[in-house]
Protein backbone atom coordinates (compact mmCIF):
# COMPACT_ATOMS: atom_id res chain seq x y z
CA UNK A 1 0.00 0.00 0.00
CA UNK A 2 1.25 3.54 -0.66
CA UNK A 3 3.34 4.93 2.20
CA UNK A 4 2.51 8.01 4.21
CA UNK A 5 4.06 11.38 3.37
CA UNK A 6 6.53 11.01 6.27
CA UNK A 7 7.57 7.55 5.05
CA UNK A 8 8.03 8.94 1.55
CA UNK A 9 10.29 11.73 2.87
CA UNK A 10 12.41 9.22 4.81
CA UNK A 11 12.62 7.01 1.71
CA UNK A 12 13.70 9.92 -0.50
CA UNK A 13 16.34 10.95 2.05
CA UNK A 14 17.62 7.35 2.11
CA UNK A 15 17.89 7.29 -1.69
CA UNK A 16 19.71 10.65 -1.78
CA UNK A 17 22.12 9.47 0.92
CA UNK A 18 22.81 6.23 -0.98
CA UNK A 19 23.42 8.12 -4.22
CA UNK A 20 25.81 10.56 -2.53
CA UNK A 21 27.80 7.68 -1.05
CA UNK A 22 27.79 5.89 -4.42
CA UNK A 23 29.08 9.00 -6.25
CA UNK A 24 31.90 9.37 -3.72
CA UNK A 25 32.81 5.69 -4.03
CA UNK A 26 32.69 5.91 -7.82
CA UNK A 27 35.20 8.76 -7.86
CA UNK A 28 37.50 6.67 -5.65
CA UNK A 29 37.13 3.66 -7.94
CA UNK A 30 37.88 5.63 -11.08
CA UNK A 31 40.89 7.33 -9.49
CA UNK A 32 42.27 4.39 -7.50
CA UNK A 33 45.16 2.22 -8.58
CA UNK A 34 44.31 -1.21 -9.92
CA UNK A 35 40.70 -0.30 -10.65
CA UNK A 36 39.10 -0.04 -14.05
CA UNK A 37 39.49 3.47 -15.46
CA UNK A 38 36.94 4.98 -17.76
CA UNK A 39 37.69 4.17 -21.38
CA UNK A 40 37.24 6.69 -24.15
CA UNK A 41 33.88 6.66 -25.87
CA UNK A 42 33.56 4.22 -28.73
CA UNK A 43 33.53 5.58 -32.26
CA UNK A 44 30.24 6.61 -33.80
CA UNK A 45 30.26 3.58 -36.06
CA UNK A 46 30.16 1.30 -33.00
CA UNK A 47 27.46 3.20 -31.15
CA UNK A 48 24.23 1.39 -30.48
CA UNK A 49 21.18 2.48 -32.40
CA UNK A 50 18.42 4.15 -30.43
CA UNK A 51 16.13 1.36 -29.26
CA UNK A 52 13.53 3.57 -27.63
CA UNK A 53 10.83 1.79 -29.55
CA UNK A 54 7.94 4.03 -30.50
CA UNK A 55 5.60 1.34 -31.73
CA UNK A 56 2.45 2.33 -33.55
CA UNK A 57 -0.20 2.84 -30.87
CA UNK A 58 -3.32 3.25 -32.99
CA UNK A 59 -4.96 -0.02 -32.01
CA UNK A 60 -8.06 0.82 -34.03
CA UNK A 61 -6.01 0.38 -37.21
CA UNK A 62 -4.85 -3.12 -36.21
CA UNK A 63 -6.65 -6.17 -37.50
CA UNK A 64 -7.39 -9.03 -35.13
CA UNK A 65 -4.15 -10.83 -34.25
CA UNK A 66 -2.00 -8.08 -35.80
CA UNK A 67 0.82 -6.33 -33.92
CA UNK A 68 2.13 -2.77 -34.39
CA UNK A 69 5.28 -1.86 -36.27
CA UNK A 70 8.29 -1.80 -33.95
CA UNK A 71 6.91 -4.50 -31.65
CA UNK A 72 9.71 -6.46 -29.98
CA UNK A 73 9.73 -10.25 -30.32
CA UNK A 74 12.44 -12.10 -28.47
CA UNK A 75 13.67 -14.75 -26.08
CA UNK A 76 15.43 -14.52 -22.74
CA UNK A 77 18.26 -16.09 -20.78
CA UNK A 78 19.90 -15.34 -17.43
CA UNK A 79 23.64 -15.44 -16.79
CA UNK A 80 23.84 -18.04 -14.04
CA UNK A 81 21.30 -20.29 -15.73
CA UNK A 82 23.13 -20.56 -19.06
CA UNK A 83 26.74 -19.34 -18.84
CA UNK A 84 28.30 -22.01 -16.63
CA UNK A 85 31.20 -21.85 -14.18
CA UNK A 86 29.82 -18.93 -12.17
CA UNK A 87 32.08 -19.79 -9.25
CA UNK A 88 32.11 -16.39 -7.52
CA UNK A 89 28.35 -16.25 -7.07
CA UNK A 90 26.22 -16.87 -4.00
CA UNK A 91 24.21 -19.53 -5.81
CA UNK A 92 27.31 -21.55 -6.72
CA UNK A 93 28.16 -21.79 -3.02
CA UNK A 94 24.64 -22.88 -2.07
CA UNK A 95 24.41 -25.44 -4.89
CA UNK A 96 27.63 -27.14 -3.87
CA UNK A 97 27.07 -27.26 -0.11
CA UNK A 98 26.05 -30.46 1.65
CA UNK A 99 23.22 -30.61 2.40
CA UNK A 100 21.69 -28.35 -0.24
CA UNK A 101 18.19 -27.42 -1.38
CA UNK A 102 19.26 -27.65 -5.03
CA UNK A 103 18.51 -30.88 -6.90
CA UNK A 104 21.85 -30.54 -8.72
CA UNK A 105 24.56 -27.90 -9.26
CA UNK A 106 24.61 -25.61 -12.31
CA UNK A 107 28.11 -26.71 -13.37
CA UNK A 108 28.81 -25.79 -16.99
CA UNK A 109 25.12 -24.95 -17.58
CA UNK A 110 24.67 -24.44 -21.35
CA UNK A 111 28.24 -23.16 -21.82
CA UNK A 112 26.65 -19.98 -23.17
CA UNK A 113 29.63 -18.01 -21.87
CA UNK A 114 31.70 -19.50 -24.70
CA UNK A 115 28.85 -20.09 -27.18
CA UNK A 116 26.98 -16.79 -26.99
CA UNK A 117 27.65 -16.05 -30.65
CA UNK A 118 26.03 -19.30 -31.73
CA UNK A 119 23.04 -18.67 -29.47
CA UNK A 120 22.48 -15.05 -30.48
CA UNK A 121 22.66 -16.07 -34.15
CA UNK A 122 19.63 -18.31 -33.57
CA UNK A 123 17.40 -15.29 -32.93
CA UNK A 124 17.46 -13.61 -36.37
CA UNK A 125 17.55 -17.06 -37.96
CA UNK A 126 14.18 -17.72 -36.32
CA UNK A 127 12.82 -14.23 -37.02
CA UNK A 128 13.17 -12.79 -33.51
CA UNK A 129 14.55 -9.27 -33.03
CA UNK A 130 15.33 -9.04 -29.29
CA UNK A 131 17.63 -10.85 -26.85
CA UNK A 132 17.06 -10.40 -23.14
CA UNK A 133 20.05 -11.48 -21.07
CA UNK A 134 21.72 -10.60 -17.78
CA UNK A 135 25.14 -9.42 -16.73
CA UNK A 136 26.77 -11.50 -13.98
CA UNK A 137 27.66 -9.13 -11.18
CA UNK A 138 29.90 -11.76 -9.55
CA UNK A 139 32.04 -11.95 -12.70
CA UNK A 140 32.28 -8.19 -13.15
CA UNK A 141 33.00 -7.40 -9.47
CA UNK A 142 34.46 -10.62 -7.98
CA UNK A 143 35.78 -8.71 -4.95
CA UNK A 144 34.39 -5.49 -3.45
CA UNK A 145 35.44 -2.54 -5.59
CA UNK A 146 37.57 -4.65 -7.94
CA UNK A 147 36.08 -4.60 -11.43
CA UNK A 148 37.28 -7.09 -14.02
CA UNK A 149 38.16 -5.41 -17.31
CA UNK A 150 38.25 -8.84 -18.97
CA UNK A 151 34.66 -9.60 -17.95
CA UNK A 152 33.42 -6.17 -18.98
CA UNK A 153 35.11 -6.83 -22.32
CA UNK A 154 33.31 -10.17 -22.55
CA UNK A 155 29.91 -8.53 -22.20
CA UNK A 156 30.97 -5.85 -24.67
CA UNK A 157 31.50 -8.64 -27.22
CA UNK A 158 28.06 -10.05 -26.39
CA UNK A 159 26.46 -6.65 -27.01
CA UNK A 160 28.44 -6.08 -30.20
CA UNK A 161 27.32 -9.49 -31.45
CA UNK A 162 23.70 -8.49 -30.87
CA UNK A 163 24.16 -5.38 -32.99
CA UNK A 164 26.01 -7.26 -35.69
CA UNK A 165 23.08 -9.69 -35.87
CA UNK A 166 20.48 -6.90 -35.91
CA UNK A 167 19.14 -7.90 -32.49
CA UNK A 168 18.06 -5.45 -29.77
CA UNK A 169 19.88 -6.22 -26.49
CA UNK A 170 17.58 -5.97 -23.46
CA UNK A 171 19.99 -6.14 -20.52
CA UNK A 172 19.21 -7.12 -16.93
CA UNK A 173 21.74 -5.84 -14.39
CA UNK A 174 20.84 -8.43 -11.74
CA UNK A 175 18.98 -11.70 -12.32
CA UNK A 176 18.88 -13.15 -8.79
CA UNK A 177 22.56 -14.09 -8.27
CA UNK A 178 24.98 -11.76 -6.51
CA UNK A 179 28.71 -11.91 -5.70
CA UNK A 180 29.56 -14.25 -2.85
CA UNK A 181 31.15 -11.39 -0.90
CA UNK A 182 27.89 -9.40 -1.20
CA UNK A 183 25.83 -12.27 0.24
CA UNK A 184 28.40 -12.69 3.01
CA UNK A 185 27.93 -9.10 4.18
CA UNK A 186 24.17 -9.55 4.42
CA UNK A 187 23.11 -9.27 0.78
CA UNK A 188 20.06 -7.13 0.10
CA UNK A 189 19.47 -6.95 3.86
CA UNK A 190 22.67 -4.93 4.34
CA UNK A 191 22.32 -1.15 4.85
CA UNK A 192 25.06 -0.72 2.22
CA UNK A 193 23.37 -2.90 -0.42
CA UNK A 194 21.79 -0.13 -2.47
CA UNK A 195 25.04 1.88 -2.55
CA UNK A 196 27.02 -1.14 -3.72
CA UNK A 197 24.45 -1.97 -6.39
CA UNK A 198 24.45 1.64 -7.61
CA UNK A 199 28.26 1.57 -7.86
CA UNK A 200 28.09 -1.60 -9.96
CA UNK A 201 25.32 -0.15 -12.17
CA UNK A 202 27.32 3.02 -12.76
CA UNK A 203 30.50 1.18 -13.69
CA UNK A 204 28.74 -1.15 -16.10
CA UNK A 205 26.77 1.67 -17.70
CA UNK A 206 29.84 3.88 -18.12
CA UNK A 207 31.60 1.05 -19.94
CA UNK A 208 28.76 -0.59 -21.88
CA UNK A 209 25.74 1.71 -21.80
CA UNK A 210 26.08 3.03 -25.33
CA UNK A 211 25.67 -0.51 -26.67
CA UNK A 212 22.56 -1.35 -24.66
CA UNK A 213 19.13 -1.19 -26.23
CA UNK A 214 17.13 -0.99 -23.02
CA UNK A 215 17.72 -2.27 -19.49
CA UNK A 216 16.07 -3.57 -16.35
CA UNK A 217 17.71 -3.14 -12.98
CA UNK A 218 16.35 -6.25 -11.25
CA UNK A 219 14.58 -9.46 -12.21
CA UNK A 220 11.51 -10.43 -10.17
CA UNK A 221 12.56 -8.64 -6.97
CA UNK A 222 9.04 -9.26 -5.61
CA UNK A 223 9.14 -13.05 -6.06
CA UNK A 224 9.08 -13.92 -2.36
CA UNK A 225 6.08 -11.66 -1.74
CA UNK A 226 4.34 -13.27 -4.71
CA UNK A 227 4.93 -16.79 -3.40
CA UNK A 228 4.53 -16.25 0.34
CA UNK A 229 2.43 -13.09 0.65
CA UNK A 230 -0.60 -15.24 1.45
CA UNK A 231 -0.76 -18.81 2.79
CA UNK A 232 -1.20 -21.87 0.62
CA UNK A 233 1.96 -22.43 -1.44
CA UNK A 234 2.44 -26.16 -1.86
CA UNK A 235 5.61 -28.28 -1.90
CA UNK A 236 8.24 -25.63 -1.26
CA UNK A 237 11.70 -26.17 0.21
CA UNK A 238 12.01 -22.52 1.18
CA UNK A 239 11.36 -21.28 4.69
CA UNK A 240 11.98 -24.73 6.19
CA UNK A 241 14.25 -25.62 9.11
CA UNK A 242 16.67 -27.14 6.59
CA UNK A 243 16.65 -23.87 4.66
CA UNK A 244 17.60 -21.90 7.79
CA UNK A 245 20.38 -24.36 8.65
CA UNK A 246 21.88 -24.02 5.17
CA UNK A 247 21.91 -20.22 5.50
CA UNK A 248 23.69 -20.55 8.86
CA UNK A 249 26.32 -22.87 7.38
CA UNK A 250 26.82 -20.57 4.40
CA UNK A 251 27.52 -17.72 6.82
CA UNK A 252 30.11 -19.88 8.56
CA UNK A 253 31.72 -20.69 5.21
CA UNK A 254 31.96 -16.97 4.47
CA UNK A 255 33.64 -16.34 7.82
CA UNK A 256 31.23 -13.52 8.57
CA UNK A 257 28.36 -15.39 10.18
CA UNK A 258 26.11 -13.63 7.66
CA UNK A 259 24.55 -14.87 4.46
CA UNK A 260 21.54 -13.52 2.61
CA UNK A 261 20.75 -14.22 -0.99
CA UNK A 262 17.72 -13.80 -3.22
CA UNK A 263 15.22 -16.15 -1.49
CA UNK A 264 17.51 -17.12 1.39
CA UNK A 265 17.16 -14.72 4.31
CA UNK A 266 14.69 -12.37 5.97
CA UNK A 267 12.07 -11.88 3.27
CA UNK A 268 10.77 -8.51 4.47
CA UNK A 269 14.25 -7.01 4.81
CA UNK A 270 15.33 -8.40 1.43
CA UNK A 271 12.29 -6.86 -0.27
CA UNK A 272 12.88 -3.48 1.36
CA UNK A 273 16.52 -3.58 0.24
CA UNK A 274 15.55 -4.44 -3.33
CA UNK A 275 13.07 -1.56 -3.55
CA UNK A 276 15.80 0.87 -2.52
CA UNK A 277 18.35 -0.81 -4.81
CA UNK A 278 16.11 -0.35 -7.83
CA UNK A 279 15.78 3.36 -7.12
CA UNK A 280 19.49 3.97 -6.58
CA UNK A 281 20.38 1.72 -9.52
CA UNK A 282 17.96 3.60 -11.76
CA UNK A 283 19.48 6.94 -10.76
CA UNK A 284 23.03 5.65 -11.27
CA UNK A 285 22.23 4.38 -14.77
CA UNK A 286 20.45 7.60 -15.71
CA UNK A 287 23.38 9.67 -14.43
CA UNK A 288 25.69 7.86 -16.85
CA UNK A 289 23.28 7.52 -19.81
CA UNK A 290 20.21 9.77 -19.43
CA UNK A 291 18.77 8.57 -22.74
CA UNK A 292 18.82 4.87 -21.81
CA UNK A 293 15.38 3.37 -21.18
CA UNK A 294 15.41 1.80 -17.69
CA UNK A 295 12.74 -0.42 -16.17
CA UNK A 296 12.20 -3.28 -13.76
CA UNK A 297 10.73 -6.76 -14.36
CA UNK A 298 8.18 -8.05 -11.86
CA UNK A 299 6.85 -11.55 -11.16
CA UNK A 300 3.07 -11.64 -11.54
CA UNK A 301 0.19 -14.07 -11.55
CA UNK A 302 -3.36 -13.64 -12.79
CA UNK A 303 -4.98 -13.42 -9.36
CA UNK A 304 -8.57 -14.68 -9.32
CA UNK A 305 -10.94 -14.92 -6.36
CA UNK A 306 -12.75 -18.24 -6.87
CA UNK A 307 -14.40 -18.65 -3.45
CA UNK A 308 -16.56 -16.16 -1.52
CA UNK A 309 -14.60 -14.27 1.09
CA UNK A 310 -11.30 -14.36 -0.81
CA UNK A 311 -11.23 -10.64 -1.52
CA UNK A 312 -9.25 -9.85 1.62
CA UNK A 313 -6.52 -12.30 0.67
CA UNK A 314 -6.45 -10.86 -2.84
CA UNK A 315 -5.95 -7.35 -1.47
CA UNK A 316 -3.24 -8.58 0.89
CA UNK A 317 -1.29 -10.33 -1.86
CA UNK A 318 -1.51 -7.42 -4.29
CA UNK A 319 -0.57 -4.84 -1.65
CA UNK A 320 2.53 -6.86 -0.74
CA UNK A 321 3.69 -8.15 -4.12
CA UNK A 322 2.69 -5.50 -6.67
CA UNK A 323 1.68 -2.14 -5.20
CA UNK A 324 5.16 -1.20 -3.85
CA UNK A 325 6.62 -1.76 -7.33
CA UNK A 326 3.87 0.19 -9.06
CA UNK A 327 4.61 3.05 -6.66
CA UNK A 328 8.36 3.05 -7.29
CA UNK A 329 7.90 2.63 -11.06
CA UNK A 330 5.81 5.78 -11.37
CA UNK A 331 8.90 7.90 -10.71
CA UNK A 332 11.76 5.48 -11.30
CA UNK A 333 10.97 3.51 -14.44
CA UNK A 334 10.58 4.29 -18.13
CA UNK A 335 8.79 0.99 -18.72
CA UNK A 336 7.52 -1.98 -16.71
CA UNK A 337 8.30 -5.64 -17.36
CA UNK A 338 5.50 -8.14 -16.72
CA UNK A 339 6.55 -11.75 -16.08
CA UNK A 340 3.66 -14.19 -15.83
CA UNK A 341 3.27 -17.95 -16.20
CA UNK A 342 -0.04 -18.97 -14.62
CA UNK A 343 -2.92 -17.87 -12.43
CA UNK A 344 -3.40 -17.83 -8.67
CA UNK A 345 -6.76 -19.10 -7.41
CA UNK A 346 -7.66 -17.39 -4.14
CA UNK A 347 -10.12 -18.21 -1.38
CA UNK A 348 -10.65 -16.94 2.17
CA UNK A 349 -7.79 -19.13 3.45
CA UNK A 350 -5.32 -17.93 0.81
CA UNK A 351 -3.85 -19.55 -2.29
CA UNK A 352 -5.79 -22.60 -3.53
CA UNK A 353 -4.37 -25.55 -5.49
CA UNK A 354 -5.42 -26.11 -9.12
CA UNK A 355 -8.76 -27.82 -9.54
CA UNK A 356 -8.55 -31.61 -9.85
CA UNK A 357 -8.05 -32.81 -13.40
CA UNK A 358 -6.86 -29.53 -14.95
CA UNK A 359 -3.69 -29.78 -17.07
CA UNK A 360 -0.50 -28.88 -15.21
CA UNK A 361 2.95 -27.81 -16.36
CA UNK A 362 6.09 -29.69 -15.38
CA UNK A 363 6.53 -27.14 -12.57
CA UNK A 364 3.28 -28.33 -11.02
CA UNK A 365 1.20 -25.21 -11.60
CA UNK A 366 -1.79 -24.88 -13.88
CA UNK A 367 -1.39 -24.74 -17.66
CA UNK A 368 -3.18 -21.43 -18.12
CA UNK A 369 -1.78 -19.20 -20.90
CA UNK A 370 -4.62 -16.69 -20.50
CA UNK A 371 -2.97 -15.56 -17.26
CA UNK A 372 -0.72 -13.20 -19.22
CA UNK A 373 -3.64 -11.14 -20.48
CA UNK A 374 -5.03 -10.86 -16.96
CA UNK A 375 -1.68 -9.71 -15.55
CA UNK A 376 -1.24 -7.10 -18.29
CA UNK A 377 -4.74 -5.71 -17.78
CA UNK A 378 -4.28 -5.50 -14.01
CA UNK A 379 -0.92 -3.73 -14.42
CA UNK A 380 -2.39 -1.25 -16.90
CA UNK A 381 -5.13 -0.35 -14.41
CA UNK A 382 -2.48 0.80 -11.94
CA UNK A 383 0.42 2.00 -14.09
CA UNK A 384 0.31 4.18 -17.20
CA UNK A 385 3.79 3.59 -18.63
CA UNK A 386 4.78 1.27 -21.51
CA UNK A 387 4.60 -2.45 -20.72
CA UNK A 388 6.77 -5.28 -22.01
CA UNK A 389 6.25 -8.97 -21.46
CA UNK A 390 9.78 -9.73 -20.28
CA UNK A 391 9.08 -13.38 -19.44
CA UNK A 392 6.33 -15.83 -20.35
CA UNK A 393 6.56 -19.52 -21.10
CA UNK A 394 5.89 -23.06 -20.00
CA UNK A 395 7.85 -25.99 -18.59
CA UNK A 396 7.03 -29.03 -20.72
CA UNK A 397 8.74 -31.78 -22.70
CA UNK A 398 5.76 -31.84 -25.10
CA UNK A 399 6.51 -29.11 -27.60
CA UNK A 400 3.00 -29.18 -29.05
CA UNK A 401 1.83 -27.90 -25.65
CA UNK A 402 4.43 -25.11 -25.81
CA UNK A 403 3.08 -24.06 -29.22
CA UNK A 404 -0.46 -24.03 -27.80
CA UNK A 405 0.73 -22.02 -24.79
CA UNK A 406 2.46 -19.43 -26.99
CA UNK A 407 -0.57 -19.12 -29.29
CA UNK A 408 -3.00 -18.51 -26.44
CA UNK A 409 -0.65 -16.20 -24.52
CA UNK A 410 0.16 -14.09 -27.58
CA UNK A 411 -3.57 -13.92 -28.40
CA UNK A 412 -4.01 -12.36 -24.97
CA UNK A 413 -1.40 -9.71 -25.78
CA UNK A 414 -3.30 -8.98 -29.00
CA UNK A 415 -6.52 -8.53 -27.02
CA UNK A 416 -4.73 -6.04 -24.76
CA UNK A 417 -3.53 -4.03 -27.74
CA UNK A 418 -7.10 -3.95 -29.06
CA UNK A 419 -8.05 -2.39 -25.71
CA UNK A 420 -5.40 0.35 -26.16
CA UNK A 421 -3.09 -1.13 -23.53
CA UNK A 422 0.45 0.00 -24.38
CA UNK A 423 2.27 -3.34 -24.71
CA UNK A 424 5.46 -3.02 -26.75
CA UNK A 425 7.08 -6.44 -26.76
CA UNK A 426 6.86 -10.16 -25.99
CA UNK A 427 10.01 -11.89 -24.71
CA UNK A 428 9.68 -15.65 -24.29
CA UNK A 429 11.23 -17.58 -21.43
CA UNK A 430 13.46 -19.13 -22.39
CA UNK A 431 15.73 -19.32 -25.39
CA UNK A 432 17.49 -22.45 -24.08
CA UNK A 433 16.62 -25.38 -21.85
CA UNK A 434 18.66 -24.20 -18.88
CA UNK A 435 19.35 -24.49 -15.16
CA UNK A 436 16.12 -23.84 -13.27
CA UNK A 437 17.45 -23.10 -9.80
CA UNK A 438 16.29 -25.52 -7.09
CA UNK A 439 14.84 -27.85 -9.75
CA UNK A 440 18.10 -28.15 -11.68
CA UNK A 441 17.86 -29.21 -15.32
CA UNK A 442 14.59 -31.15 -15.02
CA UNK A 443 12.17 -28.42 -16.24
CA UNK A 444 12.36 -27.62 -19.97
CA UNK A 445 11.29 -24.05 -20.78
CA UNK A 446 13.46 -23.59 -23.86
CA UNK A 447 12.64 -22.91 -27.48
CA UNK A 448 15.95 -24.65 -28.10
CA UNK A 449 17.02 -27.88 -26.41
CA UNK A 450 20.58 -28.36 -25.15
CA UNK A 451 22.48 -31.60 -24.71
CA UNK A 452 24.29 -30.83 -21.45
CA UNK A 453 27.09 -33.27 -22.27
CA UNK A 454 27.89 -32.19 -25.84
CA UNK A 455 26.20 -28.73 -25.66
CA UNK A 456 24.58 -29.40 -29.02
CA UNK A 457 21.64 -27.06 -29.68
CA UNK A 458 18.45 -28.30 -31.36
CA UNK A 459 15.74 -25.89 -32.49
CA UNK A 460 12.25 -27.00 -31.44
CA UNK A 461 9.09 -26.52 -33.55
CA UNK A 462 7.87 -23.98 -30.96
CA UNK A 463 10.84 -21.75 -31.79
CA UNK A 464 9.91 -21.84 -35.48
CA UNK A 465 6.28 -21.09 -34.59
CA UNK A 466 7.14 -18.03 -32.47
CA UNK A 467 9.54 -16.89 -35.19
CA UNK A 468 6.75 -17.04 -37.77
CA UNK A 469 4.56 -14.86 -35.58
CA UNK A 470 7.45 -12.39 -35.29
CA UNK A 471 8.23 -12.42 -39.04
CA UNK A 472 4.61 -11.66 -39.94
CA UNK A 473 3.94 -9.50 -36.87
CA UNK A 474 0.69 -11.40 -36.70
CA UNK A 475 -0.70 -14.28 -34.65
CA UNK A 476 -0.43 -17.56 -36.56
CA UNK A 477 -2.44 -20.72 -36.03
CA UNK A 478 -0.41 -23.38 -34.22
Where are each of the predicted segments found?
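N-terminal secretory signal peptides
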Residues: 1-24
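Compositionally biased, intrinsically disordered low-complexity segments enriched
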Residues: 11, 15, 25-28, 51-53, ...
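Alpha-helical and His/Cys-centered functional microenvironments
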Residues: 13, 17, 32, 179
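Active-site gating/metal-coordination segments in enzymes
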Residues: 132-135
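Non-catalytic scaffold segments within catalytic domains of secreted glycoside hydrolases
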Residues: 53-114, 120, 124-126, 140-478
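N-terminal twin-arginine translocation
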Residues: 22-31, 36-58
